[in-house]
From Swiss-Prot:
NCBIfam families: rpmJ_bact. HAMAP family: Ribosomal_bL36 (MF_00251). One of its GO terms (molecular function) is structural constituent of ribosome. This is Large ribosomal subunit protein bL36. One of its GO terms (cellular component) is cytoplasm. SUPFAM superfamilies: Ribosomal protein L36. Keywords: Ribonucleoprotein, Ribosomal protein. Pfam families: Ribosomal_L36 (PF00444). It comes from Listeria monocytogenes serovar 1/2a (strain ATCC BAA-679 / EGD-e). GO terms for biological process: translation. InterPro entries: Ribosomal_bL36, Ribosomal_bL36_sp.
Amino acid sequence: MKVRPSVKPMCEKCKVIRRKGKVMVICENPKHKQKQG
């Protein structure tokens, strides 16, 4: 899980979602998981 000021999809399988007001990226590749904060 990467914590970044700006989250961007890194591949075509990445999905940008919102959970509890936080923007997150979920993906098949665990290295691509990101959250904003």
